[in-house]
Regions:
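Outer membrane pore-forming secretion/assembly proteins and partners of Gram-negative envelopes
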Residues: 2, 22-209
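Twin-arginine (Tat) signal peptide motif
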Residues: 2-8
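Bacterial N-terminal signal peptides
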Residues: 8-19
Length: 209
């Protein structure tokens, strides 16, 4: 009888241990996927209709109004991507929101002279900060763009003026960390001679399975 009770207790202990191991494996951060969101916000002093930004960016907008001199802000683009914990992220595209911003600022970007953009993160990783809060670390964060700027005009044989362009590089590289689902300002990039700027905002959180 005692032997049977001992075997039953051992079996129960093994089952509990297996369940705890499986639960630990399911919550292992190494198995997690992360959803990253990169927001491109345009700051301008031009008289334009200011569009409503997402409620999730209210804190960011309040911070921008307190620290930057722009009259208006609008959301130019939102880039959403999914990446495995401790994985890397690479994006590149032609044209898009920077084309319209640089075109308005300098008469530059067009289908013939588009802008070129890229967004890279060497590693996206879940961590714990000193307060034991879950944070997302982005190592090797890099955003860059090549934007056409009109510098002069060449006179053709028929008298028409053909504009000349130079491509200017702009971008930011850094390492950052943030609490999950909390947008943070990474940096600002001046675009063209008008004084307009692109403000980079990023957030990240665990993606649903």
């Amino acid at each position: 009888m005692k032997k049977q009770m001992f075997l039953s207790a051992m079996l129960l202990a093994l089952c509990l241990a297996s369940g705890l191991t499986a639960q630990a494996q399911n919550t292992d951060p190494d198995d997690a996927n992360l959803e990253t969101q990169l927001y491109l916000i345009v700051g301008t002093n031009q008289d334009v209709d200011e569009a409503r930004l997402p409620a999730s960016l209210d804190g960011v907008v309040k911070q921008l109004r307190a620290s930057l001199p722009f009259k208006n802000y609008r959301l130019a683009a939102t880039l959403i991507n999914r990446v495995k914990n401790e994985g890397r992220l690479q994006l590149s595209w032609i044209g898009g929101p920077l084309a319209s911003v640089s075109g308005a600022a300098s008469g530059g970007a067009s289908p013939v002279t588009p802008s070129f953009s890229q967004f890279n993160v060497r590693q996206v990783k879940l961590q714990r900060n000193s307060e034991n809060q879950s944070v997302v670390q982005m190592l090797g964060f890099n955003f860059g763009a090549r934007i056409p700027i009109q510098v002069s005009g060449a006179i053709a044989a028929n008298g028409a003026v053909a504009p000349n362009f130079n491509y200017e590089n702009t971008g930011v590289s850094t390492d950052i960390s943030m609490r999950e689902s909390e947008p943070v300002i990474v940096g600002t990039l001046n675009v063209g001679p008008s004084g307009d700027a692109i403000i980079l905002v990023v957030s990240a959180k665990r993606a649903p399975k």
